[in-house]
């Protein structure tokens, strides 16, 4: 199981084996985080590429 942490303040947000789409607001720093296509053993074929996009409204995509 993988620990998912906020990239801004490093707070543990949740633990998961895999997921397709997660939207969460960090309870500590209030940053809005969107995570797409992550799995325990990521491959481009099964999980897609992970990328980080930062917007002016403090939304972060991984």
Swiss-Prot record:
GO CC terms, sorted: host cell cytoplasm
Similarity comment text for this entry: Belongs to the com family.
Pfam families named in the record: Zn_ribbon_Com (PF10122)
The species this protein was found in: Escherichia phage Mu (Bacteriophage Mu)
UniProt-annotated location(s): Host cytoplasm
Cofactor(s) the record lists: Zn(2+)
Induction of the gene: Expressed in the late phase of the viral replicative cycle. Expression of late genes is activated by the viral late transcription activator C.
Chief localisation class: host cell
Residues of the signal peptide: none
Protein name: Translational activator com
InterPro entries, per database record: Translation_reg_Com (IPR019294)
Highest taxon above the source species: Viruses
Cofactor note: One Zn(2+) per molecule.
This protein's record includes keyword Zinc: yes
Keyword Nucleotide-binding applies: no
Keywords from the UniProt entry: Activator, Host cytoplasm, Late protein, Metal-binding, Transcription, Transcription regulation, Zinc, Zinc-finger
């Amino acid at each position: 199981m993988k620990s998912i942490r906020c990239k801004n303040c490093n707070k543990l947000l949740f633990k998961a084996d895999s997921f397709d789409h997660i939207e969460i607001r960090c309870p500590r720093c209030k940053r809005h985080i969107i995570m797409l296509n992550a799995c325990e053993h990521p491959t481009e074929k099964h999980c897609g590429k992970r990328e980080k996009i930062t917007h002016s409204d403090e939304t972060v995509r991984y």
